[in-house]
Amino acid sequence: MTEPIRLLIAASGTGGHLFPALALAQQLPDYEIIWLGVPDRLETTLVPRQYPLQTIPVEGFQGRPSLKTIKIGWNLLRSVFTVRKLIKSKKINAVATTGGYIAAPAIVAAKLCNIPVIFHESNFIPGKVTTWLGRWCDTVAIGFRGTAKYLPNCATVWISTPVREQFRQPQSLDLPIPPNRSLIVVAGGSQGAVTVNQQVRSCVPAWVNAGAFIVHLTGKNDPEAATFSHDHYLSLEFFDNMAALLQKADLAISRAGAGTLTELAVTQTPSILIPYPFAAENHQMYNAQVFVDAGAALMFAQKSLTAEQLEQAGLDLLQSPENLATMAKAAGTLADLDSAEQLAAIVRASVEKSR
């Protein structure tokens, strides 16, 4: 009996790391997938219903060196040998990762075991792990065309960023949205956006008067979300069919995580982007700039954005269907619908080459 091909997927933390990895896994139904994550992160909720999950206690280095830095470094070193043992015991054939600090022990352990590593970097400016360890990977697939120049010593290939299958098929939206109103979708990403939420609520009356219906995904950490109500305004902590929402939306107001931007591109949704100001190396700002340069989005820095500016930007776009149509078309040029298949093909080719 032929042994199944076993792939270790190292992806942890936010939806931006997890959803592209899940999209890859969906394209490898004949592979045995084992997931590597971190305790108490989003993957402990999303992954176990589909794939066996192994966890290691790693975290990224933050701030100035301290006693905690030593502990983090020790845990990373221990994790390398934990993952190496996992690779050997499970007879893993290859490792795929979407970056973040969990990628480091996975890449090093794979090199120690002499098995291929496939890395997907979704941000325009590569993260530290990509920059440091990308040269150890067989392929570094990138989400933005311009990223290759930051990785001169890596075997890069542009494939866009994989999205979940539902984003590639028409979805029905089970929400009470009047057919004669423009739809604005506001989403703060998996980490929420309380400051932006407050500004959006002050804009709602003007946008509704201009003919809009607003679906506002507030996240779970917004204390004012339960106290605000308005006609043609729906507030939800979370909605599990973002594909349907964005396919229906005339305009999105969003953070600028790479995964979110790819979903906006695939659904051809014009956007107002407010990059998360505390993202590592300000990567969301650089991601958003690509969409601005392409004519697919407007961008505002959170620290200088006022509610009045946001309100006017929304009104200007609502009152210009031609501009929205141009932005939608531009967004569609920034992603590839077949990204997940391309990444799966890279994995398959790497495994075949190594056997």
UniProtKB/Swiss-Prot annotation:
It holds the Pfam family Glyco_tran_28_C. It catalyses: di-trans,octa-cis-undecaprenyl diphospho-N-acetyl-alpha-D-muramoyl-L-alanyl-D-glutamyl-meso-2,6-diaminopimeloyl-D-alanyl-D-alanine + UDP-N-acetyl-alpha-D-glucosamine = di-trans,octa-cis-undecaprenyl diphospho-[N-acetyl-alpha-D-glucosaminyl-(1->4)]-N-acetyl-alpha-D-muramoyl-L-alanyl-D-glutamyl-meso-2,6-diaminopimeloyl-D-alanyl-D-alanine + UDP + H(+). UDP-N-acetyl-alpha-D-glucosamine binds at residues 14-16, 123, 164, 190, 284. The keyword Magnesium does not apply. InterPro entries: GlcNAc_MurG, Glyco_trans_28_C, GlycoTrans_28_N. Gene3D superfamilies: Glycogen Phosphorylase B. Its main location: membrane. Pathway: Cell wall biogenesis; peptidoglycan biosynthesis. Its EC number is 2.4.1.227. Belongs to the glycosyltransferase 28 family. MurG subfamily. It is found in: Cell inner membrane. This is UDP-N-acetylglucosamine--N-acetylmuramyl-(pentapeptide) pyrophosphoryl-undecaprenol N-acetylglucosamine transferase. Coiled coil: none annotated. The keyword Amino-acid biosynthesis does not apply. One of its GO terms (molecular function) is UDP-N-acetyl-D-glucosamine:N-acetylmuramoyl-L-alanyl-D-glutamyl-meso-2,6-diaminopimelyl-D-alanyl-D-alanine-diphosphoundecaprenol 4-beta-N-acetylglucosaminlytransferase activity. It is a peripheral membrane protein. One of its GO terms (cellular component) is plasma membrane. Cell wall formation. Catalyzes the transfer of a GlcNAc subunit on undecaprenyl-pyrophosphoryl-MurNAc-pentapeptide (lipid intermediate I) to form undecaprenyl-pyrophosphoryl-MurNAc-(pentapeptide)GlcNAc (lipid intermediate II). Keywords: Cell cycle, Cell division, Cell inner membrane, Cell membrane, Cell shape, Cell wall biogenesis/degradation, Glycosyltransferase, Membrane, Peptidoglycan synthesis, Transferase. GO terms for biological process: carbohydrate metabolic process; cell division; cell wall organization; lipid glycosylation; peptidoglycan biosynthetic process; regulation of cell shape.
